[in-house]
Amino acid sequence: MAEEQARHVKNGLECIRALKAEPIGSLAIEEAMAAWSEISDNPGQERATCREEKAGSSGLSKPCLSAIGSTEGGAPRIRGQGPGESDDDAETLGIPPRNLQASSTGLQCYYVYDHSGEAVKGIQDADSIMVQSGLDGDSTLSGGDNESENSDVDIGEPDTEGYAITDRGSAPISMGFRASDVETAEGGEIHELLRLQSRGNNFPKLGKTLNVPPPPDPGRASTSGTPIKKGTDARLASFGTEIASLLTGGATQCARKSPSEPSGPGAPAGNVPECVSNAALIQEWTPESGTTISPRSQNNEEGGDYYDDELFSDVQDIKTALAKIHEDNQKIISKLESLLLLKGEVESIKKQINRQNISISTLEGHLSSIMIAIPGLGKDPNDPTADVEINPDLKPIIGRDSGRALAEVLKKPVASRQLQGMTNGRTSSRGQLLKEFQLKPIGKKMSSAVGFVPDTGPASRSVIRSIIKSSRLEEDRKRYLMTLLDDIKGANDLAKFHQMLMKIIMK
């Protein structure tokens, strides 16, 4: 089907090139229309008219004669034939002739007829069109599908060269045929064309040859291969199959036997080992050998294990990396949570500080308005004639007098001292303390903070025992000193014992 479509396209392009090279003149169109009008009026004169048209050609290119005509009807004509020959061929084929009507210039609409003479429309498969068979001029008709079914050639049977007849092959295209013609070839012809093409012989015929790839060898195809339907657009599927790759790691596959005969003397092959499909790893790398055996050179099972192990290790690496990333993210999240907690604590501390500042400000406001009264400093209750005056110490805390609280220990009140100072022209805050508030002089024969003076009282003996216990003397000596202290009777002996004890300790 693909070769036939290519043929139609090629011939159509040739017609277009011919029309562009030699445009059809108006005189030729009028003569053709007049001839077709005469044919429609006198069908019996078709053959004579056709011969006259062949004798007096108007200069049109033969491939384009059949492309111009009525757009409504008419049987298809063979390239190079006239109108009369078309009707004669129709009578030979058993197809009733149709009257041709003259109309405006345009492309001819072709019709296909079956054996009963009825027009067949809507046919998409060109293999089912009734066409002229062969290249030898035989006028017998054959259908594309019927021909392929009735052919003596067994489809899929390999020839002597090892190729099966699975397609139509390459057929030369004649330059003199019309674009609407469809060529068919017998199975034997296709077989011969494929054989010649495989051997590289040149075709003596004119035209171009479509190259067809050699069909696959059915012997090498896998038994479980599924057939592949190619783009033949026909009812029969091609016998192409999916062939599983026979390449396996570990060994070089054996070569296919060549059908050609050797041109020279052959080499002895007695020592050649038999071909194998797989080879196991038999040598490890050693520094002496200098060769490295890759794990990929093992058999298929070991190679599969190697790839599986490599893939597994890659997956494990990815999992480890993801786990590490997840762990780092968890650490970052924990640190962020701790920062959020610290932020909350800082906010609470700020609030507490603000509250304390408010409390301190409130206390300062209250203290600034408090007046502290000191007893005994006002009007003397025993002297009703005394002048009433405000106590100078009744002031805020911040503005207190430096002589405050001294009136209780001085001989004279502050008021009388101030009046006396004013009369003398100066003020003085100094005064004499009352006798009961004055300190007595320190006695040298009595114990005080200045020194210890032992006496006959129990307190003196307790102080001496404490001095002996807190010293760094040995325990035996401490016990001996305690015994001597208990035997001393009198103040003078006790004072001498104290002096001796202090000398022993200070050594």
UniProtKB/Swiss-Prot annotation:
Keyword Transmembrane: no
Keywords for the protein's UniProt record, in alphabetical order: Phosphoprotein, Viral RNA replication
Region (X domain (XD)): 457-507
Family per similarity comment: Belongs to the morbillivirus P protein family.
InterPro entries: P/V_Pprotein_paramyxoviral, Paramyxo_P/V_N, RNA_pol_Pprot-P_XD_paramyxovir
Post-translational modifications: Phosphorylation on serines by host CK2 is necessary for the formation of viral factories.
Gene Ontology molecular function terms on file: RNA binding; RNA-directed RNA polymerase activity
Region ranges (Disordered): 41-99, 134-163, 201-230, 252-273
This protein's domain notes: The N-terminus consists of a long intrinsically disordered tail. The central part contains the coiled-coil multimerization domain (MD). Forms a four-stranded coiled coil structure. The C-terminus constitutes the alpha-helical domain (XD) that binds to the nucleocapsid (N-RNA complex).
Location of the region described as Interaction with N0 in the Swiss-Prot/TrEMBL record: 1-48
Keyword hit for Phosphoprotein: yes
Described function: Essential cofactor of the RNA polymerase L that plays a central role in the transcription and replication by forming the polymerase complex with RNA polymerase L and recruiting L to the genomic N-RNA template for RNA synthesis. Also plays a central role in the encapsidation of nascent RNA chains by forming the encapsidation complex with the nucleocapsid protein N (N-P complex). Acts as a chaperone for newly synthesized free N protein, so-called N0, allowing encapsidation of nascent RNA chains during replication.
Interaction with the nucleocapsid (N-RNA), as annotated region: 459-507
Quaternary structure note: Homotetramer. Interacts (via multimerization domain and XD domain) with polymerase L; this interaction forms the polymerase L-P complex. Interacts (via N-terminus) with N0 (via Ncore); this interaction allows P to chaperon N0 to avoid N polymerization and non-specific RNA binding before encapsidation. Interacts (via C-terminus) with N-RNA template (via Ntail); this interaction maintains the P/L complex anchored to the nucleocapsid template during the sequential transcription. Interacts (via C-terminus) with protein C this interaction allows C to associate with the ribonucleocapsid.
Protein name, UniProt field: Phosphoprotein
Region (Multimerization): 304-376
Modified residues (Phosphoserine): 86, 151
Alphabetized Gene3D superfamilies for the sequence: 1.20.5.110, DNA helicase RuvA subunit, C-terminal domain
Encoding gene (name): P
Organism of origin: Measles virus (strain Edmonston-Moraten vaccine)
